């Protein structure tokens, strides 16, 4: 109750620093600073105060778009004989490659298309009682790997690929993986912004005690959460969602400052 009364007495400007903590950031603060709770004299939405020092959670969240797409399509064909299966497969591959080209996906400057080796397997179906072979089937399959910087084209083509089924082509597409080529630079920038946010929070809190924030004493860099937009899911090990083109990245940093 003493803590609540003390916080209630804070002016609006200081409380706004605390209140603006997003749910995802607060959840991450609990994960990254949970070990401090037992020793803290005050712990409210990501900060604690002990004698001559203050520990706060700085956070930074931004939205960005992926610029790399990785996608694969497996093409299969069945036949009663090895040759029959392979010939059907060649026709299916031709239709699939033409479909991809029609949708703007072919090997070029901003895209790479790789054809994996074709494999042929024999499958035998046996009678459950006599164990006699009652059917022999050959399956030929081959994977097409696609790496592209045109992420929206990949997303659109993925949604249409099953149209090939209407042409008798057995395709098994994977879900596209969307990533970001400049993530290393983005992480450095996010940490800098999280550190700046930590100092702003520390100064707002210290002001109410008639104190000033001094030098940096300790930094606890947390994990990054890269999620679908507006997600509240967090992981203590960090996360990297690759299912969507648009993403949110959140960095959390526990920072201890000296208090004068």
Spans of model-derived segments:
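Short, charge-dense linear interaction motifs
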Residues: 2-260
């Amino acid at each position: 109750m003493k803590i609540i009364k003390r916080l209630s007495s804070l002016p609006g400007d200081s409380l706004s620093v605390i209140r603006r903590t997003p749910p995802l950031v607060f959840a991450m603060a609990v994960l990254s600073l949970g070990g401090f709770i037992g020793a803290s004299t005050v712990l409210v939405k990501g900060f604690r105060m002990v004698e001559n020092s203050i520990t706060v959670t700085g956070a930074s969240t931004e939205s960005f778009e992926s610029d790399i797409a990785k996608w694969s399509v497996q093409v299969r064909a069945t036949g009663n004989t090895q040759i029959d299966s392979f010939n059907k497969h060649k026709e299916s591959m031709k239709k699939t490659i033409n479909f991809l080209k029609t949708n703007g996906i072919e090997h070029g400057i901003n895209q790479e298309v790789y054809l994996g080796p074709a494999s042929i397997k024999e499958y035998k179906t046996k009678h459950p009682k006599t164990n006699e072979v009652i059917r022999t089937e050959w399956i030929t399959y081959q994977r097409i790997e696609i790496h592209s910087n045109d992420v929206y084209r990949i997303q659109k083509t993925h949604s249409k690929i099953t149209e090939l089924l209407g042409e008798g082509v057995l395709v098994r597409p994977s879900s596209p993986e969307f990533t970001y080529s400049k993530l290393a630079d983005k992480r450095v920038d996010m940490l800098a912004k999280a550190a700046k946010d930590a100092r702003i929070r520390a100064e707002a809190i210290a002001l109410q005690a008639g104190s000033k924030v001094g030098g940096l004493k300790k930094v606890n860099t947390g994990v990054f959460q890269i999620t679908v937009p507006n997600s509240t899911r967090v992981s203590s090990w960090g996360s990297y969602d690759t299912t969507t083109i648009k993403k949110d990245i959140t960095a959390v940093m526990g920072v201890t400052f000296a208090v004068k």
